[in-house]
């Protein structure tokens, strides 16, 4: 709306003669221009507000954030499921570890009892022979039961000494084999699953070349 029309509307309205066709026409034009201007301004304000706050864009952003939260929650739940499954598997595999370790001590005692029988005594004493056979059967049955529950014997003879599975008690001079090669087993070792239940107590060779030790170690990993 022009300044002249504003002046007419504000200052000359009271002096306007409505009976005069020219004044009425001028007043009508001023009113039409006023309404047109304010209608345009109102529409521009609405469009500006729509640009500032777009409901659709806001909903899309919120939906994206919720989707990201859902994906993170799903990932956390999957990690929890895997960790729980692993813990359950470990508990099932290793729950008898302490019991199995105690049974290995019993097996050791049974073997010591058998070794204590003098040579030839079994053949000369039928009762002692039957007793020894019964002890052997008991020991074999007990070890078979432990094997069914994941207990396995370590066979370190001829292998390179590994502190994770072996416990060295003494050295055996022997220049024909690489250093730290297991030469003698004093007490058998056992594992359960991937864990050492009891390390094997061994004697290791002393005097072999380090080069031979390296070559043997490489060959064992090929």
Curated annotation (Swiss-Prot):
Q: Which PROSITE patterns does its entry note?
A: GRPE (PS01071)
Cellular compartments per GO CC: cytoplasm
Kindly give the InterPro entries that the UniProt entry links to this protein.
GrpE, GrpE_coiled_coil, GrpE_head
**Principal localization?**
cytoplasm
Q: Which Gene3D superfamilies match?
A: 3.90.20.20, Head domain of nucleotide exchange factor GrpE (2.30.22.10)
Keywords recorded for this protein, A-Z = Chaperone, Cytoplasm, Stress response
Q: Where is this region: Disordered?
A: 1-21
Task: State where the protein is found.
Answer: Cytoplasm
Q: Which GO terms describe its molecular function?
A: adenyl-nucleotide exchange factor activity; protein homodimerization activity; protein-folding chaperone binding; unfolded protein binding
Q: Name one GO biological process term.
A: protein folding
One Pfam family this chain carries? GrpE
The record ties this protein, via PANTHER family, to:
GRPE PROTEIN (PTHR21237), GRPE PROTEIN HOMOLOG, MITOCHONDRIAL (PTHR21237:SF23)
The family annotation for this protein states:
Belongs to the GrpE family.
Kindly state the subunit structure of this protein.
Homodimer.
Sum up the protein's function in the record's words.
Participates actively in the response to hyperosmotic and heat shock by preventing the aggregation of stress-denatured proteins, in association with DnaK and GrpE. It is the nucleotide exchange factor for DnaK and may function as a thermosensor. Unfolded proteins bind initially to DnaJ; upon interaction with the DnaJ-bound protein, DnaK hydrolyzes its bound ATP, resulting in the formation of a stable complex. GrpE releases ADP from DnaK; ATP binding to DnaK triggers the release of the substrate protein, thus completing the reaction cycle.
Identification of the protein by name = Protein GrpE
Which gene is transcribed and translated to give this protein? grpE
């Amino acid at each position: 709306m022009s300044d002249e029309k504003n002046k007419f509307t504000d200052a000359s309205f009271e002096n306007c003669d409505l009976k005069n066709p020219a004044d009425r026409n001028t007043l009508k034009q001023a009113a039409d221009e006023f309404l047109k201007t304010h209608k345009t301004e109102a529409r521009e304000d609405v469009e500006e507000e729509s640009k500032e706050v777009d409901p659709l864009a806001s909903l899309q952003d919120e939906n994206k954030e919720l989707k990201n939260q859902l994906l993170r929650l799903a990932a956390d739940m999957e990690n929890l499921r895997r960790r729980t499954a692993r813990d359950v598997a470990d508990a099932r595999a290793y729950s008898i570890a302490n019991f199995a370790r105690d049974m290995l001590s019993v097996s050791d005692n049974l073997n010591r009892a058998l070794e204590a029988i003098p040579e030839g005594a079994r053949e000369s004493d039928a009762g002692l022979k039957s007793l020894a056979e019964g002890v052997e059967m008991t020991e074999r049955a007990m070890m078979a039961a432990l094997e069914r529950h994941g207990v396995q014997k370590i066979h370190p003879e001829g292998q390179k000494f590994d502190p994770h599975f072996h416990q060295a008690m003494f050295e055996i001079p022997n220049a024909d084999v690489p250093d730290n090669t297991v030469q003698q087993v004093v007490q058998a070792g056992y594992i359960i699953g991937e864990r050492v239940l009891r390390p094997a107590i061994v004697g290791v060779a002393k005097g072999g070349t380090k080069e031979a030790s390296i070559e043997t170690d490489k060959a064992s990993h090929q």
